[in-house]
């Protein structure tokens, strides 16, 4: 009875201390309200409580790793710098580096005040959010937007993590996209003398234009491949991490079930009795 009260008080204390984390709070309450079946010996009861405390620690680690890593809070915007670019060009948004931790987030405010996360850098990892229909890239201090259009305009932000559960807005940018000017041409009928030099210059100019377009296309494709490779690498890392946690929890549960059923103890007793029988046979 004393052990039961101590275990109950311990789980309730941990539940009270961690009541700010919803998933962990629900899991801890499920473990706390679980009752030991009648007729179970005290040694098994202690093992059950040991397993419960171990599961509590695992849930605490999982909750701390995944619950607040990607939270984006909406706060008051600082004074945003205005950046103007022409449609079809590339835009670069330059911001400061994070002061205390090596985590940086880039995103855009939708509907005026709702932050939507586009890119996150932490340590040597990068997480990119897809579905924006915009070719972009990010680094610690710069956010790149390639071949901007009028729909690319808006308010973009940079946030730095300050080693706690709060995100600090480092800078924001009001990106204005100006339509490309339409060149007016006047047709003047003048006699033209076609020579070999004129034909050669026209041919060289067309080749340069073609090569420039091909280079920009190849550069964009290369950037797309790099982004897709980074994203697939991040997905693989996340799958490996959470898969490892799942395998570890399953193995731990299997070991605790075997211990509760008494299979290791019975196997040890049988082996000891077999050894004792052999020793008695040798003595006789």
From Swiss-Prot:
It is a single-pass membrane protein. The keyword Membrane applies. Keywords: Glycoprotein, Membrane, Transmembrane, Transmembrane helix. Glycans are attached at residues 79, 102, 111, 147, 162, 174, 196, 211, 228, 234. It is found in: Membrane. One of its GO terms (cellular component) is membrane. The chain crosses the membrane at residues 239-259. Belongs to the RL11 family. This is Uncharacterized protein UL6. It comes from Human cytomegalovirus (strain AD169).
């Amino acid at each position: 009875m004393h052990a039961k009260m101590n275990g109950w008080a311990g789980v309730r204390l941990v539940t009270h201390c961690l009541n700010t984390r919803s998933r962990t709070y629900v899991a801890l309450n499920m473990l706390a309200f679980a009752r030991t079946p009648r007729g179970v010996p005290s040694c098994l009861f202690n093992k059950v409580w040991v397993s419960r405390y171990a599961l509590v620690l695992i849930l605490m680690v999982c909750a701390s790793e995944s619950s607040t890593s990607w939270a984006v809070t909406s706060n008051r915007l600082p004074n945003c710098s205005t950046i103007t670019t022409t449609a079809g060009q590339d835009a670069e948004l330059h911001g400061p580096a994070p002061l205390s931790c090596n985590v940086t987030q880039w995103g855009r405010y939708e509907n005026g005040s709702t932050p939507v996360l586009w890119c996150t850098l932490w340590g040597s990892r990068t997480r990119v959010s897809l579905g924006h229909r915009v070719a972009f890239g990010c680094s610690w201090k710069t956010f790149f937007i390639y071949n901007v259009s009028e729909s690319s305009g808006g308010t973009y932000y940079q946030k730095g993590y300050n080693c706690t559960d709060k995100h600090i807005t480092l800078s924001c940018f009001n990106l204005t996209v100006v339509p490309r000017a339409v060149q007016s041409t006047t047709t003047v009928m003048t006699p033209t003398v076609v020579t070999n030099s004129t034909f050669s210059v026209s041919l060289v100019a067309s080749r340069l234009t073609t090569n420039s377009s091909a280079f920009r296309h190849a550069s964009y494709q290369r950037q797309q491949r790099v982004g897709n490779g980074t994203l697939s690498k991040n997905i693989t890392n996340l799958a490996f991490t959470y898969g490892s946690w799942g395998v570890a929890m399953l193995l731990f549960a299997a070991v605790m079930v075997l211990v509760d059923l008494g299979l290791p103890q019975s196997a040890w007793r049988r082996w000891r009795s077999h050894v004792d029988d052999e020793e008695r046979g040798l003595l006789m």
